[in-house]
Amino acid sequence: MLELNLQLFAHKKGGGSTSNGRDSQAKRLGAKASDGELVSGGSILFRQRGTHIHPGTNVGRGGDDTLFAKIEGTVKFEMKRGKKHVSVYPVVAK
């Protein structure tokens, strides 16, 4: 008796999984208050990773390098010693 052993192979590659197709959420970094804007104490002025902009007068720096206003006043972006700083100056009553 003659026995025939037939095997059929795929003529196209299987559609396997891919390592692409995902992305991280945007972190919403950048300026949150503009130059000349009136802000209250505790307001976030600039969200950043590292010290892209340095804290100036009446501005604090959080643990994630976020810059925030320590007092109520007007925001001023300025250059000091070749570096960008953001300061908050109190409003002068007239």
Curated annotation (Swiss-Prot):
Similarity field: Belongs to the bacterial ribosomal protein bL27 family.
GO aspect biological process, one term: translation
Gene: rpmA
Residue ranges the record assigns to the propeptide: 1-9
HAMAP family for the chain: Ribosomal_bL27
SUPFAM superfamilies noted in UniProt: Ribosomal L27 protein-like (SSF110324)
Region of interest (Disordered), residue spans: 12-33
Phylogenetic lineage: Bacteria, Bacillati, Bacillota, Bacilli, Lactobacillales
Cellular component annotations (GO), alphabetically ordered: cytosolic large ribosomal subunit
UniProt keyword annotations, A-Z: Ribonucleoprotein, Ribosomal protein
Keyword Ribonucleoprotein: yes
GO terms of molecular function: structural constituent of ribosome
Key word DNA-binding present: no
Record PTM text: The N-terminus is cleaved by ribosomal processing cysteine protease Prp.
Protein name per the record: Large ribosomal subunit protein bL27
